[in-house]
Amino acid sequence: MAAGLGSGNMDTTTQASFIPAIWGEKLNDFYRQELKAAAFFEDLSDEVVGGGNIIYIPNISQMTANTKTQGSAVTLNDQTSGKVTLTINTWKEVSFLVEDIVDAFWKKSYRMQEKFMKNAGYTVAKELEQALLNLCRGFSQTVGSSALALRDSNIRAAIAYLDSANVPENDRAFFLHPNVIWNQIQGINKFSLLTNTNGADPVLKGEVYKLYGIPVIKTSLLGTYLGHRDGMLAGRDALNFATSNLSGGMSGEGGVVRLQTQYVQEYLGTLVTADILFGVIENRDTSGVWIKAKSS
């Protein structure tokens, strides 16, 4: 065996000037919540392709059947029709400017401007998503409370509300926060035990994403309000939205987002702006249920 090294050998302290710190090829971008509400609820953007900022949605109520007697005139129905007003009045933008010196020094493999542009587009699209989800607080029908975990009885009560209002069964979805799904609902044997899921492992097979046959849309964008965690059960037509057709806008599940770049000689840099112009409205109150649960 070789003898131990004596003094005077090279080490990391004496050779520090020759040991580089490496910026790796990997870049940690922030995680993005999938935007799902705008893909589910009714999009009326086509109504304003030719211009306009207000969409009127007429309401039709059910007529009344009357008894007809011989020799008498029929009883006429005279409906008073109301309307829902959707106003496009929310304009959100995300902008940044990259000076030439910064662009020259950026590590090229990071493709930083492309990543920042993608982030800007996502951020403004998320504003529409958040606005739609926040509308759940306007539903007059509610179940649950801030003090208790969401229970099976709350879920059934929410479904009963929509059934009583004759909301189409094939156009419904639950919107729930991950904490409510995994910390509360999955603690209910009916929804988690293998024996209660037709032999399919609910975790591996994704059965957690249906409650009584109704799809569950999981989103971390559902906030807390007055101490409880927001959630909802809604029909597709419960909420409506529209995005204005901004020149150069690109359609997607997050609505129409416009992304622009311009070289600004005054600052010797490239200005990038992502923006969206939209409006949201509760269209059918009886087609939605505000679900409240404890926040954790």
Report each predicted region and the residues it spans.
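Short secondary-structure boundary segments
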Residues: 1-18, 60-67, 116-134
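Sequence/fold signature of self-assembling virion shell proteins
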Residues: 2-44, 48-51, 58-62, 85-89, ...
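Generic alpha-helical secondary structure signal
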Residues: 21, 25, 110-111, 149, ...
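Charge-rich, low-complexity amphipathic helices
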Residues: 44-45, 49-53, 57, 79, ...
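Long, contiguous amphipathic alpha-helices that act as assembly "spine/axial" helices in icosahedral shell
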Residues: 57-59, 81-144, 166-176, 216, ...
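Active-site-surrounding "flap" and adjacent substrate/cofactor-binding loops of secreted or lumenal enzymes
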Residues: 62-65, 70-83
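Residue-level detector of alpha-helical recognition elements and their boundaries
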Residues: 72, 134-135, 287
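Extended, solvent-exposed, turn-rich assembly/linker loops in the middle of proteins
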Residues: 137-209
